[in-house]
């Protein structure tokens, strides 16, 4: 809820989709100090909440995670050290997620296999690059 307006009703989400949003919450708690003002992260969360009203909440939560990481200085699209870690299609999808403009249509389709590959990569990225073990790891799989 924001300024008396319900952004989207998380209680209507499936268990799997809600777990993805818990992932976003856990990510924010891991990356951003409590009580410290962080306008970019706030803007990402607000835009994601608005977008989740009308679009796939699981995909929106994943896009928000990518954007939050980049805003915190951990851009998963730039830090692909091992080019074999992701297929070309998954790398392209990850870059399209990173560049997505809230409120605009998403360019192209999202294959389940490529999305799953990106989700596995994100969990590894958080563990290896950010030194963060997520309790909700695997939420997007």
Regions found by a protein language model. Give the residues of each.
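Non-catalytic alpha-helical scaffolds and adjoining flexible linkers that form interface surfaces
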Residues: 1-141
